[in-house]
Swiss-Prot record:
Family per record: Belongs to the bacterial ribosomal protein bS6 family.
Organism name: Deinococcus radiodurans (strain ATCC 13939 / DSM 20539 / JCM 16871 / CCUG 27074 / LMG 4051 / NBRC 15346 / NCIMB 9279 / VKM B-1422 / R1)
Biological process annotations from GO: translation
Name of the gene encoding the protein in the UniProt record: rpsF
Entry keywords, A to Z: Ribonucleoprotein, Ribosomal protein, RNA-binding, rRNA-binding
Protein name: Small ribosomal subunit protein bS6
Domain of life the protein comes from: Bacteria
Length: 102
């Protein structure tokens, strides 16, 4: 099984109920792609490095998922159709990127 990082930026003006609805949809999309969620980091509203549409802020969600095969396109394409999703990035996680060699 490969490990992937799924990073999302949502509309910063959504309510807590809408955030929960989006999280449920994301979990279903990940499961439908044959993957499982191993970790979720809910970072909340943060300032963006550059303006996306009319927004200078975004609601950040960072998932760590495990899957066999290549679920990137299936997950990203289904999530990009959501109105509250501003950006989607699915990256294959590699352990050597997280450790610094001396």
């Amino acid at each position: 099984m490969n490990q992937y990082d799924l990073n999302l930026i949502l509309n910063p003006n959504i309510s807590a109920e809408q955030v929960q609805t989006e999280k449920d949809y994301i979990e279903n999309a990940v499961r439908n792609a044959g993957a499982e969620i191993s970790n979720l980091d809910d970072l909340g509203n943060r300032r963006l490095a550059y303006q996306v549409g009319k927004d200078r802020e975004g609601y950040y969600l960072m998932y760590t998922i495990k899957a066999s095969g290549n679920p990137e396109t299936a997950i990203a394409s289904s999530l990009r159709l959501r109105d509250n999703v501003r950006r989607v990035l699915v990256v294959k996680d590699r352990p050597e990127w997280k450790t610094k060699k001396a």
